[in-house]
Amino acid sequence: VNIPAENVYVGEDSVAEQLKDLDLLDLAAATGMKQKECTVKELKEALKKKDVVYTGDYTDLEYKKLVTSKVDLAILTGEVLPQKEDKEVSSDSDSKKKLTEKEQRELLKDMTERFATLGIPMIVDRSQDEKEELAKAEWIKVYGAIFGKQDEASQLFEKIEKEAKTTDTVKEAK
């Protein structure tokens, strides 16, 4: 991963929120969310203005658009990782399709090979797989390290940690 990345593929809202918190959302060049699906206002507006390109979700990425957008880092969600049970995925036509574990593995293998061929490093954000809220929030430190904003990320995490302790104290008092 070249640090800092300049043109990022943002797989979903949770990643976009983390980038927004670090004032890095302007690095988003491409996304896996359609405008109507996006809940991050700034990213939704960038999609509308075509400052950010929709390149498809992980099941149907348009690699040519990633190259055209000069993406130099792809941040994907843990959804890309194979699961033991059949997984329902949506396609661009908004229909649902079930993928077997083998199909999921093949999809991941194909995707990683294509990213490698294109010279685009990829990161799988596992924050949504974390059980504890603080563990989810700690992913901000990962993005701080990747984008050279360690101090800002540490401050944000400390703030979240402090708020969590305050909330726990209030719960204990009840």
Segments from the language model and where they lie:
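A short, structured surface patch at a secondary-structure boundary
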Residues: 1-105
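Extracytoplasmic substrate-binding proteins
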Residues: 7, 51, 68, 72-174
